[in-house]
From Swiss-Prot:
This is SAGA-associated factor 11. Pfam families: Sgf11, Sgf11_N. Its main location: nucleus. It comes from Candida glabrata (strain ATCC 2001 / BCRC 20586 / JCM 3761 / NBRC 0622 / NRRL Y-65 / CBS 138) (Yeast). Keywords: Activator, Chromatin regulator, Metal-binding, Nucleus, Transcription, Transcription regulation, Zinc, Zinc-finger.
Amino acid sequence: MTEQHETIQSVTDGIYNNLVTSMIHSIVSKETAREKLLRSRYGSYKQYHYDPNSQLDIHGNPKQQDSSQYFYCENCGREVSGNRFAAHLQRCLTRGSRR
């Protein structure tokens, strides 16, 4: 009886292992095909840079202060600081519509 029990156990283990292995192979092949499709559409992606000191941006470049960036206002022709650009546009556009 024990030999028959061991044989049944080994057969069931083999069937179970084959099922699990085929499921894993199926999942891996589907995900590999999906990954290849995504890479062919969008190319490979570049990892973002992580700086624990917050001195660099996500691309690894030194951070710039908003006040050091200036933008050109198309409406009035002035250069405006980046941290004041939204407020300037609101004033500039409402002032221009009153004239």
